[in-house]
Regions:
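Conserved phosphate-binding/catalytic region of the ribokinase-like
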Residues: 2-36, 50-162
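Non-cysteine beta-strand/loop elements that form the S-adenosyl-L-methionine
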Residues: 35-44
Length: 162
């Protein structure tokens, strides 16, 4: 808790990644943090932070607007894609890879791209699209053994946009 306070006090652009997994479930809630500029989480983490078992993403988004949460935030939805929630709108981007091999690290890959782009470029739909493509490519490999290259990313983007 003390480290969180130190970070929030001394860093003015704070991106937060809280993807729940089997090792940290129930311990990594976004509600522990008060000051951040961007939040990325999976649907399970979204449910945990809102203290609900509700599965409908639209209901969860509506419920989040009644709770204290900073905008923008992104929720990864696995094979369904992801959604970026801002104060006045939500933007959904589908998944482009449906035959994944291993999703370990995909949330981290999504966060790496979207948090960096959120800092430098404010086209949130483009950021979400690139995050989904990068995370989807990452899920085509076992574990974190191989990182997606710039060429693989460019080739996939061109293929999707054709």
């Amino acid at each position: 808790k003390n480290m969180i306070n130190i970070l929030e006090k001394n860093i003015n652009n704070f991106a937060l990644n809280v993807h729940a997994n089997s090792l940290n479930s129930n311990y990594n809630k976004f509600t522990k943090y008060k000051k951040y500029n961007y939040l990325s989480m999976n649907k399970k983490e979204f449910q945990l932070g809102l203290n609900t078992a509700e599965n409908n993403i639209n209901y969860l988004i509506k419920d989040s607007k009644e709770n204290k949460i900073n905008y923008p935030f992104a929720v990864t939805l696995g094979n369904e894609g992801s959604v970026l929630v801002e104060k006045k709108k939500e933007q959904f981007v589908p998944s482009f890879f449906h035959k994944t091999i291993d999703t370990v690290g995909s949330g981290d890959a999504f966060f790496a791209i979207t948090s960096a782009l959120n800092k430098i470029k404010k086209d949130n739909l483009l950021n979400l699209f690139l995050g989904n493509v990068y995370a989807g490519l990452h899920a085509l490999n076992i574990g974190n053994k191989k990182f997606v290259t710039k060429d693989e990313l460019k080739k996939s983007i061109n293929s999707i946009l054709k």
